[in-house]
């Protein structure tokens, strides 16, 4: 149940960020270029004091994950995939 609540919270934050991005783009006018996929990073930080279902799946407390457009940054490793605006990207995590 906690896993479902955590995933729902992550989804809501992501959707809110995308909505703010789209409303900001509408305010800027038609002249502006749309940001590239690399600029639309979504970060997720997992912190749990006790063992959770996410830890059983491999997500450890204190891990910082970012949805990257292409390659993981220095000190990060590919830990799966994520989707932004229907485009699949690399999920990069570091401790």
Curated annotation (Swiss-Prot):
<dbReference type="Pfam" id="PF00323">
    <property type="entry name" value="Defensin_1"/>
</dbReference>
<dbReference type="GO" id="GO:0002227">
    <property type="term" value="P:innate immune response in mucosa"/>
</dbReference>
<dbReference type="InterPro" id="IPR006081">
    <property type="entry name" value="Alpha-defensin_C"/>
</dbReference>
<feature type="propeptide">
    <location>
        <begin position="20"/>
        <end position="62"/>
    </location>
</feature>
<dbReference type="GO" id="GO:0061844">
    <property type="term" value="P:antimicrobial humoral immune response mediated by antimicrobial peptide"/>
</dbReference>
<dbReference type="Pfam" id="PF00879">
    <property type="entry name" value="Defensin_propep"/>
</dbReference>
<keyword id="KW-1015">Disulfide bond</keyword>
<dbReference type="InterPro" id="IPR006080">
    <property type="entry name" value="Beta/alpha-defensin_C"/>
</dbReference>
<dbReference type="GO" id="GO:0071222">
    <property type="term" value="P:cellular response to lipopolysaccharide"/>
</dbReference>
<keyword id="KW-0732">Signal</keyword>
<comment type="function">
    <text>Microbicidal activity.</text>
</comment>
<feature type="disulfide bond">
    <location>
        <begin position="72"/>
        <end position="92"/>
    </location>
</feature>
<dbReference type="GO" id="GO:0051673">
    <property type="term" value="P:disruption of plasma membrane integrity in another organism"/>
</dbReference>
<dbReference type="GO" id="GO:0050829">
    <property type="term" value="P:defense response to Gram-negative bacterium"/>
</dbReference>
<comment type="similarity">
    <text>Belongs to the alpha-defensin family.</text>
</comment>
<dbReference type="GO" id="GO:0005615">
    <property type="term" value="C:extracellular space"/>
</dbReference>
<dbReference type="InterPro" id="IPR002366">
    <property type="entry name" value="Alpha-defensin_N"/>
</dbReference>
<dbReference type="GO" id="GO:0031012">
    <property type="term" value="C:extracellular matrix"/>
</dbReference>
<dbReference type="GO" id="GO:0019731">
    <property type="term" value="P:antibacterial humoral response"/>
</dbReference>
<feature type="disulfide bond">
    <location>
        <begin position="65"/>
        <end position="93"/>
    </location>
</feature>
<keyword id="KW-0964">Secreted</keyword>
<dbReference type="InterPro" id="IPR016327">
    <property type="entry name" value="Alpha-defensin"/>
</dbReference>
<protein>
    <recommendedName>
        <fullName>Neutrophil antibiotic peptide NP-5</fullName>
    </recommendedName>
</protein>
<keyword id="KW-0211">Defensin</keyword>
<keyword id="KW-0929">Antimicrobial</keyword>
<keyword id="KW-0044">Antibiotic</keyword>
<feature type="signal peptide">
    <location>
        <begin position="1"/>
        <end position="19"/>
    </location>
</feature>
<dbReference type="GO" id="GO:0050830">
    <property type="term" value="P:defense response to Gram-positive bacterium"/>
</dbReference>
<feature type="disulfide bond">
    <location>
        <begin position="67"/>
        <end position="82"/>
    </location>
</feature>
